[in-house]
């Protein structure tokens, strides 16, 4: 995109497309209907259809109970408002015929996507179950991942439900050293960070995984576990000329929020790496 052809509506779309190339966690979130509009921080959206009805015993001759369900099951609050404010030097812009602006847009897009993924990774604190391995090596990691799969099965996750395992690069190395064989898929289809399938998990690697000291807070979860809503309103994108400088600039506001809608389908996998005794 050339700076001269700047249009807020076009830039808003450009910053939001291609999330599969820029994010890991964002592509693994709930895909069902989320009702409402995002215009500012503090907006409330409604997640529809994530609850399950109650099954009751039928007794002939007695009235049956009508379960009253709200039009939505859970609220989602827009809690995050992140911005970038980028200067584009007019001399550089002229020399590069607008390409400098295109580079700045791409870098802004990547930076916003990275911040978004780090936000979603923080939901490990709301997991319904935690599995620990304080001596994670290539020899012990398989049993830990099997426990994570077991936890999801015990949460009544259907076999056909999409389930994901997101790990840090250090933990992925343990899988490689353990000679774990992944069922390969098309990374262009599955998105950024995809390494293959194992134990019914789509395995992804992300630098957004949170750490506490030497503990890597990896996450095993289903598509139904985490919901996210985001927007970059065209009204919150501006091109302007800063004072006291020969430069142009643009600023962008990214609004989003998320929530855990099925804690039982989110497993926190705390892994502390240990030295390998044999490779």
Model segments located where?
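N-terminal "assembly arms/tails" that initiate or stabilize quaternary assembly
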Residues: 1-74, 266-273, 277
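Residue-level signal for secondary-structure boundary sites
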Residues: 55, 94, 173, 211, ...
């Amino acid at each position: 995109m050339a700076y001269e052809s700047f249009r807020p509506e076009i830039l808003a779309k450009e910053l939001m497309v291609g999330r599969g190339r820029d994010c890991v966690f964002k592509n693994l979130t709930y895909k069902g209907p989320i009702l409402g509009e995002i215009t500012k921080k503090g907006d409330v959206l409604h997640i529809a259809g994530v609850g399950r009805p109650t099954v009751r015993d039928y007794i002939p001759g007695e009235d049956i109970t009508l379960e009253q369900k709200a039009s939505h099951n859970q609220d989602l609050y827009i809690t995050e408002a992140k911005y970038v404010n980028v200067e584009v030097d007019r001399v550089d812009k002229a020399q590069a015929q607008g390409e400098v602006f295109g580079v700045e847009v791409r870098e802004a897009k990547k930076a916003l996507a990275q911040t978004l993924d780090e936000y979603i990774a923080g939901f490990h604190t709301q997991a319904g179950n935690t599995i620990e391995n304080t001596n994670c090596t290539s020899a012990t990691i398989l049993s830990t991942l099997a426990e994570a799969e077991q936890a999801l099965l015990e949460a009544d996750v259907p076999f056909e439900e999409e389930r994901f395992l997101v790990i840090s690069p250090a933990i992925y190395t343990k899988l490689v050293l353990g000679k774990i064989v992944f069922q390969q898929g098309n990374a262009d289809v599955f998105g950024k960070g995809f390494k293959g399938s194992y134990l019914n998990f789509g395995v992804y690697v992300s630098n957004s995984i949170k750490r506490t000291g030497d503990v890597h807070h990896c996450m095993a979860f289903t598509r139904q576990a985490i919901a996210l809503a985001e927007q970059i309103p065209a009204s919150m994108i501006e091109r302007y000329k800063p004072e006291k400088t020969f430069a142009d600039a643009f600023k962008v506001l990214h609004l989003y929020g998320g929530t855990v809608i099925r804690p039982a389908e989110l497993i926190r996998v705390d892994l502390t790496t240990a030295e390998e005794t044999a490779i």
